[in-house]
Amino acid sequence: MADSQDDKLYKAEYAKSGRASCKKCKDNIAKDSLRMAIMVQSPMFDGKVPHWHHFSCFWLRAAVQSPSDISGFTDLRWDDQEKVKTAIESGGATGGKGGQKGAAKGEKTLNDFAVEYAKSNRSTCKGCDQKIEKDQIRVSKKTVDPEKPQLGLIDRWYHTGCFVSRREELIFKPEYSAAQLKGFAVLRDEDKEELKKRLPAVKSEGKRKADEVDGGVSKKQKKEDEKLEQNLKDQSQLIWGIKDKLKKFCSINDMKELLIANSQEVPSGESNIVDRLSDCMAFGSLKPCETCKGQLVFKSDAYYCTGDISAWTKCVFKTQTPDRKDWVTPKEFSEIPFLKKFKFKRQDRVFPKDAPPAAATPSSGSTTSAATSVSSASKNLTEAPADKPLTGMKLLAVGKLSKNKDDLKKFVEDLGGKITGTASKAALCISSKKEIEKMSKKMEEVRDAGVRVVADDFLTDIKESGKALQELISLHAISPWGAEVKVEAPAAAAATKSTGAHSSKSTGKVKEEEGGSKSKKMKLTVKGGAAVDPDSGLENCAHVLEQNGKIYSATLGLVDIVRGTNSYYKLQLLEDDVQKRYWVFRSWGRVGTTIGGNKLDKFYDKNSAMDNFCGVYEEKTGNAWASSNFTKYPNKFYPLEIDYGQDEEAVKKLTQSAGAKSQLEKPVQDLIRMIFDVESMKKAMVEFEIDLQKMPLGKLSKRQIQSAYSLLSEVQQAVADSSSESLILDLSNRFYTLIPHDFGMKKPPLLSNVDYIQQKVQMLDNLLDIEVAYSLLRGGVENNEKDPIDINYEKLKTKIEVVDKSSHEAQLILQYVKNTHAATHNTYTLDVEEIFKIEREGEYQRYRPFKELPNRQLLWHGSRTTNYAGILSQGLRIAPPEAPVTGYMFGKGVYFADMVSKSANYCHTSQADPVGLILLGEVALGNMHELKKASHITKLPKGKHSVKGLGRSAPDPRATVSLNGVDIPLGKGMNTNIDDTSLLYNEYIVYDVSQVNLKYLLKIRFNYQTSLW
């Protein structure tokens, strides 16, 4: 598995055997010789593996910028450290095996820079994003794509001028010259001369003169650097002197006993034992971690803790100055000459200049701000996406904008995005209406690619506004074309060859570059209590064993944000449908990808198969299969309360045959189909990053969702209290394990900011309603007399009638829709397709006591289509007690609006799915507590019955009409002259669901703007 503290792209060590072969030349790497690796994503499990190379072959594939990029560099012998440094400084040229000579005499070719004549006009300059014409000179900086490191160095091409202007940024060092570029020798003579002028080497004399200008400061710095270098050399020789003697004079058992005698944990592997022992003998025995009492271990730039702060999370403590005690050699080792003569001398370990100082991660009692308490130990943690709103997006700029190209590029990159020059690669285009009218060739490419165009003030708004990305895109869209913008997920590692089969064992496959992160669709065959995993190849001839009411099937999860892992493990005991044959099938990998593998073990008696199943389960979880109380252990999997879609087939049959015998009016039939549309539910879950393979619709338990709410409450409180990053990390790991997410190859993001936590709260709100809808669908499947649509209609326990659009009440509602469409919601218009009158069973009786309150209004409430089965069957609900309070502007209540488009925005429709549902409810507001800014209401002031958030615009009160004693504020929007409010439009909140009586349900079509004129 990937090391929890080491996420570096490269690794160096001495070969432990002579079995490994070089990935470049395919020859074996001799034992004890220096070998270098590029770390790549394993296709077999959720972690990284080294691709080893001979030292000389390595530099033909890697572009190392600094020794600190290499894990294990400081553990090398001094001479080998110098060798690596020299290779880095010379651009990877080693002069050894595989080395290449440059064009100029005595100069070596730089392996990570190249020059050539462009072979076509398809390449794009990485500096200016413009095309490089065929036969034009282009210069490349070779880099490793972090998502596909196994591909080695990849050319990133530049125009000559663009490369020259970025010389320092591209680390083309002053001492490098054009003559050292790979391919320089084959250029035409005149081009060679021109390139030499533009990319000259800076002479060393010039450097010395510059140093003299700085005077004593540079001399002093140089002296300090030389002293540090000598100290590092002496330190390396001391450590390796100890290592060599330990290997020569001590057995492995002797070394283990020495570690135990000095209260140190004994690691696995001879090299690890020697490393730890030499460190302790040189600098002193390490005291336990001050945070978790775990074992500290030296790794390249600091001492890292290998312990755990909880059963869910590894400790992230690291330091360069650990507490130590004197090394003690037990008397029984006095017969070993080396140990008898060894005299311990206390000293501190010296670190290279480029090693960042390691600050210890604050413990749970720290008062450090949560925003800044992330230690360097966890610098690679992925922050919540809300921090950089354009993360994963490529933008194209067309025409003259308010910012020049360089400023725009920096601005976009600061927001997490990238600028591209190719329309087909862009998610969004920044331009102006003038450019659209002009319709240049570039804008034609944008239109043909279907890329939405937004005005350039979109960038300013997204930086300063707290609004959602999609909402801002809709607000600033200026093109008559363009689909809903999707954020691009980083590509996974390139696919490797696989011999996957349904036999004894299969290898995994890494996703294709453009494959995104969606799990493959599987047809699940349900037999008895659970579905047989189709990857077993036995779905047609076997079933999952069920004994004493227990189904022998388990899905396990393990998330570690520090490691970047998001793993699953599936286990099933299968019994032949006819014969007495048994199999234990297991599969594993990374959630949301095809990374992983599987294994099928065959047994001829039940007891042997059960023993194997129980043994694997206990190995992976630390718990016995028969145990009733599960205990989570560090680095062990956690069982998820899910299954492979029990009742899925029955639900499909129910929905597919719907409508043939229905007694309902056609518009009501269509409404029921819409509310119970399983595909819409699945789309919603995918939108929430839920992994449908591990969390299918059929098994969204309320208990699981409520536990997830509680975790979000805890993490929200931790962020608010500026708790330690370790606590937030722990809660994040637990949340993602409980609710499996599909992040593809991205690291699971830390739940470290309020906006991202609120996104997850909204996700759980919607999952609760989806759970209700699916539970209703599964119930009452047996009735063959009634039409499935009628059965589902009855489950809602709501009387639904179609309202004639020519009726008085319908005309009032249509006027209400027309007049209260807010001016700022100008990216769509609304058409009312159907109006339904609704009457929820028992709701009027509940509402009757509040009917006596003054100020009853008919107000809007919008929600996703997938939520309406829950809303109609159970009513509008207040967020559960487990849910965090953050994100609710006026506390936990039921929210309404008097502007139709304010509520319509919560329908979450799109151009691809433009039909939504919106409610009109009679709300007993009584005496309102009026507010202009956020206030977390837990109890209303005495004499108040509701809260009104005052907006800057509202329906003209003079046009309010009454229908059966209920006010309908259907006037056109007007300025309220309230300027000191944080709300654009009014909000109404009640804190008792009994104050709501749902009256109408509207089916509305969103007409997204298709024309600018």
From Swiss-Prot:
Q: Cite the WGR domain residue spans from the record.
A: 541-637
Where can this protein be found? Chromosome; Nucleus; Nucleus, Nucleolus; Cytoplasm, Cytosol
Write down the superkingdom of origin.
Eukaryota
GO MF terms on file? damaged DNA binding; DNA binding; NAD binding; NAD+ poly-ADP-ribosyltransferase activity; NAD+-protein mono-ADP-ribosyltransferase activity; NAD+-protein-aspartate ADP-ribosyltransferase activity; NAD+-protein-glutamate ADP-ribosyltransferase activity; NAD+-protein-histidine ADP-ribosyltransferase activity
List modified residues, type PolyADP-ribosyl glutamic acid: E413, E435, E444, E445, E464, E471, E484, E488, E512, E513
The annotated modulation of its activity is: ADP-ribosyltransferase activity is regulated via an allosteric activation mechanism. In absence of activation signal, parp1 is autoinhibited by the PARP alpha-helical domain (also named HD region), which prevents effective NAD(+)-binding. Activity is highly stimulated by signals, such as DNA strand breaks. Binding to damaged DNA unfolds the PARP alpha-helical domain, relieving autoinhibition.
Q: What is its EC number?
A: 2.4.2.30, 2.4.2.-
Tell me the Pfam families matching this sequence: BRCT, PADR1_N, PARP, PARP_reg, WGR, zf-PARP, Zn_ribbon_PADR1
Its PTM note reads:
Poly-ADP-ribosylated on serine, glutamate and aspartate residues by autocatalysis. Auto-ADP-ribosylation on serine takes place following interaction with HPF1. Auto poly-ADP-ribosylation on serine residues promotes its dissociation from chromatin.
User: Which keywords are on file for this protein?
Assistant: ADP-ribosylation, Allosteric enzyme, Apoptosis, Chromosome, Cytoplasm, DNA damage, DNA repair, DNA-binding, Glycosyltransferase, Immunity, Innate immunity, Isopeptide bond, Metal-binding, NAD, Nucleotidyltransferase, Nucleus, Repeat, Transcription, Transcription regulation, Transferase, Zinc, Zinc-finger
Q: For the PARP alpha-helical domain, which residue ranges apply?
A: 661-778
Could you say which residues bind NAD(+) here? H861, G862, S863, G870, R877, S903
Recorded catalytic reaction(s): these are: NAD(+) + (ADP-D-ribosyl)n-acceptor = nicotinamide + (ADP-D-ribosyl)n+1-acceptor + H(+); L-seryl-[protein] + NAD(+) = O-(ADP-D-ribosyl)-L-seryl-[protein] + nicotinamide + H(+); L-aspartyl-[protein] + NAD(+) = 4-O-(ADP-D-ribosyl)-L-aspartyl-[protein] + nicotinamide; L-glutamyl-[protein] + NAD(+) = 5-O-(ADP-D-ribosyl)-L-glutamyl-[protein] + nicotinamide
Per UniProt, the enzyme's principal EC class comes to: transferase
Residues where Zn(2+) 2 binds: C125, C128, H159, C162
Q: What Gene3D superfamilies does the annotation carry?
A: 1.10.20.130, 2.20.25.630, 3.90.228.10, BRCT domain, Poly(ADP-ribose) polymerase, regulatory domain, Zinc finger, PARP-type
Claim: Transferase is one of the keywords in the record: yes
User: Domain BRCT spans what residues?
Assistant: 385-461
Comp. bias (Low complexity):
356-378, 494-507
Predominant cellular place of this UniProt entry's protein: nucleus
Among InterPro entries, the record links this protein to: ARTD/PARP (IPR050800), BRCT_dom (IPR001357), BRCT_dom_sf (IPR036420), PADR1_C_dom_sf (IPR038650), PARP (IPR008288), PARP1-like_PADR1_N (IPR049296), PARP1-like_PADR1_Zn_ribbon (IPR012982), Poly(ADP-ribose)pol_cat_dom (IPR012317)
Q: Output the Gene Ontology cellular-component terms.
A: chromatin; cytosol; nuclear replication fork; nucleolus; nucleus; site of DNA damage
Q: Which family does it belong to?
A: Belongs to the ARTD/PARP family.
What is recorded about the protein's domains?
The two PARP-type zinc-fingers (also named Zn1 and Zn2) specifically recognize DNA strand breaks: PARP-type zinc-finger 1 binds PARP-type zinc-finger 2 from a separate parp1 molecule to form a dimeric module that specifically recognizes DNA strand breaks.
What is annotated about its quaternary structure and interactions? Homodimer; PARP-type zinc-fingers from separate parp1 molecules form a dimer module that specifically recognizes DNA strand breaks.
This one is known as Poly [ADP-ribose] polymerase 1
Q: Which gene encodes it?
A: parp1
